[in-house]
Amino acid sequence: MILLVDAGNTNIVLGVHNGERYIASWRISSEGNKTSDEYGIQVMQLFNLSDIDPKNITGVIVSSVVPNIMHSLENMLRKCFCHEPIIVGPGVKTGINIKYDNPREVGADRIVNAVAAYEIYKRPVIIIDFGTATTFCAVRANGDYLGGCICPGIRISADALFERAAKLPRVELEVPKNMICKNTVSSMQSGIIFGYIGQVEYIVKKMKQEMKNSKYKEEPFVLATGGLANLIAKETDVIDKVDSDLTLEGLKILYEKNKEIEISQR
């Protein structure tokens, strides 16, 4: 039984896989001022509520884009599970070829998603991860990670509008019935959601053109993941599939490729 941990800027997602299926997954806040004990209390309560014995965990892997929580998070995992966690980063075997100018700049979340897409789908793919930031990544059928782009996430865009425009309220991220709206809240939702859909469609169009017109001439499959993927996917035809478990699947694959690291550290 392995514990998979994906630490993002807003939430930490934890999943437990028993070798055949996920038996539990949870989401907790990734507030930067928590101690290892505070994280431990939260995580142990979740294990208890799901009737899972922490002693049955045989390995742990972590992907993080939040450096300031890693000290507390790693200490908690060592204390609670008595395993040295594998940290996704330099030195970890991925099975993909990162074509970035500086491969160390690529976020762990993007690497994990790329590994999952390559291993599961075995075809050229554009991965859109709707998180705190929205990332677009291009991966060839042979596992070459070509790069991509990074945009402010939908919630960041909505929060910026609320924070910088004095008379505009904070709004729920819901799709309005019409593009032309007759009240402030719906008008903001229209601009935020439909504007974001337009951004996604244009970026996907340009990325497809570059992948098709390059020497590779590949037609990519468009895969979406992240908390708001379903919201956007329902409103556009450029997304071929939503895979909500893509990041956890990538972590599971990376654990299998690197579990000898954890064994050697015992």
From Swiss-Prot:
Its main location: cytoplasm. GO terms for biological process: coenzyme A biosynthetic process. This is Type III pantothenate kinase. InterPro entries: ATPase_NBD, Type_III_PanK. Pathway: Cofactor biosynthesis; coenzyme A biosynthesis; CoA from (R)-pantothenate: step 1/5. NCBIfam families: baf, PRK13318.1-5, PRK13318.1-6, PRK13321.1. It is found in: Cytoplasm. Disulfide bonds: none annotated. It comes from Clostridium beijerinckii (strain ATCC 51743 / NCIMB 8052).
